[in-house]
């Protein structure tokens, strides 16, 4: 978990999935560690220490989003990734920036609920087991003798043992479960998210407490009963307080495509709305209080990580106030041939490993020779240079094209070993890589 990991440990964890980009990894690792450091500082100074937001600048496909995605798994904290382009200035058609915090709160509630339900799982399993046994063995009526009760208890123990061993899994039973209301998606006008949420909550609450009889197998029933019993053991009010505290102290927001809302001085037209989004984001980033259905949430200590390619605009095109709220700037490098090679061989779930695993299900043994990997990396790099630089994503296209025929006829090659060397790569991709017009449409 991130709060106990040192920056170097966080970086080495990210290294398993992302090649290079050490500056960005370091910045993110330090920002995560600083959350833990801040918690160790005594009040009132702790309240004054705010996170230093990060702006990642670099072309598409070099690892900006992947760093955020992997960070989400590492960070034991509410995390949300959103596209800045989805939001519009208040009053325009589109999403209001306050929904960022509401979505983050939903994420935190879900995360906290899962964590709390794990804590009470053992108790919930016992209660679910008893409810199942009550259905399988309805209690005998008391007629004044104690012996049947003893016999009943022994039978119950026998059934409990069978239940734990799984020998009753396929038996069909009928039992009463909470009847959840079907979820309703209500579309509301922009700026009226609060009212829409209240209406949705009101409809969701109509079905509470209702029961429905359902027929199912014991195995499925056991899972549903565990969830139902765990939900009873979790205190909803306490859960809300924990989730809100978690959002306020540990929340992370990843703002992708922030360059798309930067105003370019020489272009007119829709710039008002773009600047408006930036101005709406400003109070959120510098610290404000947002109303959610779970309560008021302060954004003072939420960490914001923004990223953008900045091809058509520059970070200086953002409004000065917003620029000042992202003091840590990190430039990500374009990928070289060596980087492409490393991506294909050194990452934990590399594309080569994925294709080997997929084709092994058809008994095809796929072997990648070093010269084959090198040639693939050269072709991906070359096409990026000639056509459009889409970074590591080019490897998906190249690999898919390379193995298209093999994947299609995999059943015919069952039991064979296929070696991907430079000659194999050139045979299938050589002409495409050389011909720029073909590359533009195929690769």
Swiss-Prot record:
GO terms for biological process: protein unfolding; proteolysis involved in protein catabolic process. It is found in: Cytoplasm. HAMAP family: HslU. ATP binds at residues 19, 61-66, 256, 321, 393. Keywords: ATP-binding, Chaperone, Cytoplasm, Nucleotide-binding. It comes from Cupriavidus necator (strain ATCC 17699 / DSM 428 / KCTC 22496 / NCIMB 10442 / H16 / Stanier 337) (Ralstonia eutropha). The gene is hslU. It comes from the Bacteria. One of its GO terms (molecular function) is ATP binding. This is ATP-dependent protease ATPase subunit HslU. A double ring-shaped homohexamer of HslV is capped on each side by a ring-shaped HslU homohexamer. The assembly of the HslU/HslV complex is dependent on binding of ATP. InterPro entries: AAA+_ATPase (IPR003593), ATP-dep_Clp_protease_ClpX (IPR050052), ATPase_AAA_core (IPR003959), Clp_ATPase_C (IPR019489), HslU (IPR004491), P-loop_NTPase (IPR027417). ATPase subunit of a proteasome-like degradation complex; this subunit has chaperone activity. The binding of ATP and its subsequent hydrolysis by HslU are essential for unfolding of protein substrates subsequently hydrolyzed by HslV. HslU recognizes the N-terminal part of its protein substrates and unfolds these before they are guided to HslV for hydrolysis. Belongs to the ClpX chaperone family. HslU subfamily. Its main location: cytoplasm. GO terms for cellular component: HslUV protease complex.
């Amino acid at each position: 978990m991130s709060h106990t990991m040192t920056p170097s440990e966080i970086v080495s964890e990210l290294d398993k999935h992302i090649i290079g980009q050490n500056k960005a990894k370091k910045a993110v690792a330090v920002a995560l560690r600083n959350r833990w450091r801040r918690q160790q500082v005594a009040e009132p100074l702790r309240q004054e220490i705010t996170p230093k937001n990060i702006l990642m600048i670099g072309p598409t496909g070099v690892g900006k989003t992947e760093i955020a995605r992997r960070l989400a798994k590492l960070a034991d904290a509410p995390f949300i990734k959103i596209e800045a382009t989805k939001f519009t200035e208040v009053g325009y058609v589109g999403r209001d920036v306050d929904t960022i915090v509401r979505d983050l709160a939903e994420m935190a509630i879900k995360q906290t609920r899962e964590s709390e339900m794990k804590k009470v799982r053992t108790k919930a399993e016992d209660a679910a087991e008893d409810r199942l046994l009550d259905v399988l063995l309805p209690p005998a009526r008391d007629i004044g003798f104690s012996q049947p009760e003893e016999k009943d208890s022994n039978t119950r123990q026998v059934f409990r043992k069978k239940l734990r061993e799984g020998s009753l899994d396929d038996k069909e039973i009928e039992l009463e479960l909470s009847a959840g209301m079907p979820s309703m998606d209500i579309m509301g006008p922009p700026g009226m998210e609060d009212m829409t949420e209240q209406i949705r909550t009101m409809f969701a609450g109509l079905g509470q407490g209702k029961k429905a009889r359902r027929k199912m197998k014991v195995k499925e029933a056991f899972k549903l009963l565990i969830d139902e019993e765990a939900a009873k053991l979790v205190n909803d009010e306490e859960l809300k307080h924990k989730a809100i505290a978690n959002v306020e102290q540990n929340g992370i927001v990843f703002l992708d495509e922030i360059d798309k809302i930067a105003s370019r001085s020489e272009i007119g037209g829709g710039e008002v709305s773009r600047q408006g989004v930036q101005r709406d984001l400003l109070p959120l980033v510098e610290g404000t209080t947002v109303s959610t259905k779970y309560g008021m949430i302060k954004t003072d200590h939420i960490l914001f990580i923004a990223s953008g390619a900045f091809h058509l605009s520059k970070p200086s095109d953002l409004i000065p106030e917003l620029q000042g709220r992202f003091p840590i700037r990190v430039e990500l490098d374009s990928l070289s041939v060596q980087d492409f090679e490393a991506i294909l061989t050194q990452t934990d779930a590399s594309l080569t490993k994925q294709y080997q695993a997929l084709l092994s299900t058809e008994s095809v043994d796929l072997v990648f020779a070093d010269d084959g990997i090198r040639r693939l990396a050269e072709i991906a790099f070359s096409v990026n240079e000639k056509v459009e630089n889409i970074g590591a994503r080019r490897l998906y296209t190249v690999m898919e094209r390379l193995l298209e025929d093999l994947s299609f006829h995999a059943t015919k090659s069952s039991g064979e070993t296929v070696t991907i060397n430079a000659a194999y790569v050139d045979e299938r991709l050589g002409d495409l890589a050389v011909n720029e017009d073909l590359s533009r449409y195929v690769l």
